[in-house]
Amino acid sequence: MAGVKSLQPRLISSFLGNNSIRSTQPLIHLFRFDLGRRHVSMQLSRTFSGLTDLLFNRRNEDEVIDGKRKRLRPGNVSPRRPVPGHITKPPYVDSLQAPGISSGLEVHDKKGIECMRASGILAARVRDYAGTLVKPGVTTDEIDEAVHNMIIENGAYPSPLGYGGFPKSVCTSVNECICHGIPDSRPLEDGDIINIDVTVYLNGYHGDTSATFFCGNVDEKAKKLVEVTKESLDKAISICGPGVEYKKIGKVIHDLADKHKYGVVRQFVGHGVGSVFHADPVVLHFRNNEAGRMVLNQTFTIEPMLTIGSRNPIMWDDNWTVVTEDASLSAQFEHTILITKDGAEILTKC
């Protein structure tokens, strides 16, 4: 599909990095966030085909912000960490082309649900352990090393590693970084906030979760953003259940963000997750009129990203790291949930 000129890029997923998605939908639909797909099957191209420049304003990294906080700068990225041969790897790791969002809902049987619970619990344990490492002076690369080791010691594979060329086992997004921060040599500083996004592949199923942690003494403005972002996720999960419209998730999150005058990032979405890392449904975190209802025994993520200032993203030249255009703080929380007859079960909760 990469060479078909009539096809236009359409959607950025929650974890796509330097990959374009193509479908038969016109490009303008991307900017209107018209995500009605009518069962369009999508694939990724390793060439970005200008999509990054269309979606993300690339700005000079030397722009300055107020004197209270230094603008985030990239550090040195260490070599990719090895994974023992006995660890089962997701199919995309050895592929020359990263997968996109797979069309079609995955509805789990009893065994699938058990596997999802196991991967979700492990992801949650790793996430919480990583949070204990957040201290001034600790580098995000050190956090990545600890996460990597804990995952493989438990017989699982760190899902981000090798996904479309992503070089690390976890995403670490500090301060104005909205998502997909690459762990590097930068030491955390007192007052930072950091989102740690963990996904594990265990027994053929992915468990996906993230949380934003405080580093040292964090000011009240940052604390409030983090607390409200967590509240938005909790409220969204509370309304989920069989037959509920997906669009209600976006309304709940957007309404709470508006109440506190926060921005809601639109370019990144929640998604189905299971035996495939990213699948239907596409879960929007802002108000929308998209069709679709939740189905018993399906699993998907909800992962709102709220900002104090501009909700518009800038992508760094690494084609992964996404930051707010005005360097304002961003926070995110994420859970994988299972739709049950009584509502929703949080799978990524210890």
UniProtKB/Swiss-Prot annotation:
Its cofactor is Co(2+); Zn(2+); Mn(2+); Fe(2+). Ubiquitous. Preferentially expressed in green tissues. A divalent metal cation 1 binds at residues 197, 208, 334. Residues 71-90 are annotated as: Disordered. PROSITE patterns: MAP_1. A divalent metal cation 2 binds at residues 208, 271, 303, 334. It is found in: Plastid, Chloroplast; Mitochondrion. One of its GO terms (molecular function) is initiator methionyl aminopeptidase activity. It comes from the Eukaryota. One of its GO terms (biological process) is N-terminal protein amino acid modification. Substrate binds at residues 180, 278. It holds the Pfam family Peptidase_M24. This is Methionine aminopeptidase 1D, chloroplastic/mitochondrial. The lineage of its organism: Eukaryota, Viridiplantae, Streptophyta, Embryophyta, Tracheophyta. The gene is MAP1D.
